[in-house]
Design a protein with these regions (language model features):
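Short glycine/serine/threonine-rich phosphate/pyrophosphate-binding segments
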Residues: 22-28, 48-51, 180
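A glycine/threonine-rich phosphate-anchoring loop and its flanking beta-alpha core
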Residues: 32-126
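A short secondary-structure junction motif
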Residues: 103, 107-111, 140, 163, ...
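C-terminal charged capping/lid subdomain of soluble metabolic enzymes
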Residues: 112, 220-293
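N-terminal small/polar loop signature for handling phosphorylated ligands or for N-terminal nucleophile
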Residues: 1-39, 139-153
Length: 293
């Protein structure tokens, strides 16, 4: 509201959103409120905000507040991979962790549903989101570390920003359905209630452990172990300790998780008890993997 009240913004012909996810989502609100066209210029590849018709807003303590649904997505997204390559590597790293959630979360949310055209397209496209991250992720991080806008970095940036963003647009509406996110993000939404975790670790970093939790809950152990090995290879978390959560924190995370929209998006009924156990079991699998390396 403060930005939208500025005279230079009111008098502008269009809104340019330059920066990361929170800057972009702020501009979505401004563009919607002032009925101005929005163009996005992501300076990092840490999420799909530059492409989506959804905004995520947070409280001052970094805990999740609510979603905002503009009437349309940004008109165009401009990606300069050299800018991405010169951004902090840890943001690309966290972006990989966040994007790893798209395929498994959409699949879980849409399983058993008779989907109409648009969300069916989203589910089909979600299947394209994981493999590029696993195939190119490690090399992309190396290129980012060297500030090189190579092909691997481009493939990963496009996956994080564009592929997952298009899936989000196809699987999310303000009122009809929300198949965009599930248990992996439930771990993230609970983590800020544990200051050591929520304040010290990036969104995608925590979500990447949430992916292992979701796949454990879903008993998809083969896929979990594949992504666990990938996480370990690039330094993404595979244990609770790596995101500063302890056994005593799990119920707090689960209690918060059960209150968010993502908990209710699947035809499957989730329980807090099983969710806590899935976090424990994912942690045990991660510890075992690391011990054997």
């Amino acid at each position: 509201d403060m930005v939208a009240a500025l005279e230079e913004v009111k008098n502008a012909d269009m809104v340019f959103a330059v920066g990361g996810g929170r800057a972009v989502d702020t501009c979505k609100y401004v563009a919607e409120k002032l009925d101005k066209p929005l163009f996005t210029f992501p300076t990092i590849a840490s999420n799909c905000a530059p492409v989506t018709a959804i905004g995520v807003f947070y409280n001052p303590d970094d805990s999740f507040k609510d979603y905002f649904y503009p009437t349309r997505c940004p008109l165009h997204t401009f990606i300069d991979t050299q800018v991405i390559a010169e951004a902090p590597e840890k943001l690309l790293w966290a972006g990989i962790g966040d994007a790893l959630s798209k395929e498994c979360e959409v699949e879980l949310c849409t399983r058993g549903r008779d989907l109409p055209h648009t969300p069916l397209m989203g589910r089909t496209m979600a299947a394209c989101c994981t493999d590029p991250l696993v195939s190119y992720g490690k090399q992309a991080l190396e290129q980012c570390r060297a500030n090189v806008a190579g092909d691997a970095l481009a493939q990963v940036a496009l996956c994080i920003i564009v592929s997952t963003g298009i899936v989000s647009n196809f699987t999310t509406t303000a009122n009809d359905y929300y198949y965009n996110s599930s248990l992996a993000h439930c771990v993230y939404y609970g983590a800020p209630l544990v200051p050591a975790s929520g304040h010290n670790h990036l969104h995608g970093e925590i979500v990447s452990f949430g992916v292992l939790t979701l796949l454990t809950y879903d008993k998809n152990f083969a896929r979990r172990d594949e992504l666990l090995a990938f996480n370990a290879s690039v330094g993404l978390p595979v244990t609770l300790a790596q995101i500063e959560l302890t056994e005593n924190d799990l119920q707090t995370v689960a209690d918060k998780a059960a209150t968010v929209l993502e908990w209710r998006c699947s035809l499957q009924t989730f329980t807090k008890e099983a969710f806590v156990q899935a976090m424990r079991d994912a942690d045990a699998a991660g510890k075992k993997y690391l011990a054997n390396q």
